[in-house]
């Protein structure tokens, strides 16, 4: 990632964490199709590796705006993909992909973080990884903690996430017939890969 700042990358991770943690409400649905969001997407597309993934997400958002009962349909997609059994779903948990669910707990402790009691999901949920990455990128931008320490923890987090994210994304593509969450997951995968290469 060359054109995006640490804070901008942190914002993308925080935004993705929010979208993968719960169904979109009416306000989020309006926001994702707003002119402000179009500007944000344009900024993300200035990073060449993200361009195709953002284009696809914009296509899904455009289709979403003309979808009947868009919020209800998207909520059904979210539920079917992320809350059902793993037979025809893309469960957003490291443990669903035979990964060590304790790894994220160790990473959170190392970062001096803990999960919120308001988030009623297991600690190995995708959103927790993304919130941690967001926190680490914000910390890099602040310069209060040695960058080497933050970067080491960022790489550990990315490595742990990369163990199962490709399979999660493949399952999103396989089972998300509308394609919004498939496009969102593809953007996440490209972001994580670019972030990992930016050592």
From Swiss-Prot:
In its keyword annotation, does this UniProt entry include Chaperone?
A: yes
Q: Does the keyword Chaperone apply?
A: yes
Keywords of this entry: Chaperone, Cytoplasm
Pfam families hit by this protein: Nitrate_red_del (PF02613)
* Matches recorded under InterPro entries: Chaperone_TorD, DMSO/NO3_reduct_chaperone, HscB_C_sf, TorD-like_sf, TorD/DmsD_chaperones
Q: Which GO terms describe its cellular component?
A: cytoplasm
What domain of life does the UniProt record list for this protein's source?
A: Bacteria
What's a single GO BP term from this record? protein complex oligomerization
Cellular localization per UniProt: Cytoplasm
Family assignment from sequence similarity: Belongs to the TorD/DmsD family. TorD subfamily.
HAMAP family from the entry? TorD
What this chain does, per the record?
Answer: Involved in the biogenesis of TorA. Acts on TorA before the insertion of the molybdenum cofactor and, as a result, probably favors a conformation of the apoenzyme that is competent for acquiring the cofactor.
Q: How is this protein named in the record? A: Chaperone protein TorD
Question: What gene, per UniProt, encodes this protein?
Answer: torD
């Amino acid at each position: 990632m060359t054109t995006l700042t640490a804070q901008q990358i942190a914002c993308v991770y925080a935004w993705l964490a929010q979208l993968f943690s719960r169904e979109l409400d009416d306000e989020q649905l309006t926001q994702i199709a707003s002119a402000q969001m179009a500007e944000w997407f344009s900024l993300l597309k200035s990073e060449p590796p993200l361009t195709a993934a953002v284009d696809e997400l914009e296509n899904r958002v455009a289709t979403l705006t003309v979808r009947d009962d868009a919020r209800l349909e998207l909520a059904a997609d979210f539920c079917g993909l992320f809350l059902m059994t793993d037979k025809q779903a893309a469960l957003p948990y490291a443990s669903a992909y035979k990964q060590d669910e304790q790894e994220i707990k160790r990473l959170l402790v190392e970062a001096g973080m803990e999960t919120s009691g308001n988030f009623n999901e297991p600690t190995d949920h995708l959103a927790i990884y993304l919130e941690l990455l967001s926190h680490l990128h914000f910390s890099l931008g602040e310069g209060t903690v040695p960058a080497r320490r933050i970067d080491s923890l960022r790489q550990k987090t990315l490595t742990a996430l990369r163990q199962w994210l490709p399979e999660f994304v493949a399952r999103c593509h396989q089972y998300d017939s509308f394609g919004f969450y498939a496009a969102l997951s593809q953007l996440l995968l490209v972001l994580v890969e670019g972030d990992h290469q930016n050592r």
